[in-house]
Amino acid sequence: ITLFVFWEGTTIASVILIFAARTERAYRAGMRYLVIQIGSGLFLLAGAVIYYAETGSIAFGAFDPATIAGALILLAFGIKCAFPLLHNWLEDAYPEATVTGTVILSAFTTKLAVYALARGFAGTEFLVPIGATMTAFPIFFAVIENDLRRVLSYSLNNQLGFMVVGIGIGTELSLSGTAAHAFCHVIYKALLFMSMGAVLYRTGTIKASELGGLY
């Protein structure tokens, strides 16, 4: 229940950061983000209620994805972790937030889902092909994208895939590697988004086709 409360708390805080850009695109992206993430929270709450009805416990531990409760909770985590077919909110919302907001979003929102997956579904083998797919498909979108902050959003989705693979493997070494990767990713992706913010402030555009000679 505590996880659900703060899960929804991050949604509200994230939407505020997106709306802070005060553009029409940011408003539309923020509303899509809000609807999708509230849906994620409802799946989490439904799974928690069913889990309590079945076990009499609300302790956050390892869940069985073969049960209804486990499947609903996994779906909630998958939405926030941007699983394939559940990922569009990320590339829509992150580039439309303020520069500072994008840095904060990249550092904390998806990492909450990675942490939750590691706590609840470590060693769930079908996470390996899901994560492998996540490492591959964003690259094809990134290479044809003109908005550099969207490129970084696809790159973020790609890196989440490696973390999901590590969680799916579920060994002590793979989970330690996932934790280290997540920690490093918070730092270097934030720096990349800050550098794109500096380019935006300096040039007034973030379109790759309109930039050149940045030295």
Model-found features: residue ranges?
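Hydrophobic transmembrane alpha-helices and their helix-loop junctions in integral membrane proteins
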Residues: I1-T2, A13-Y215
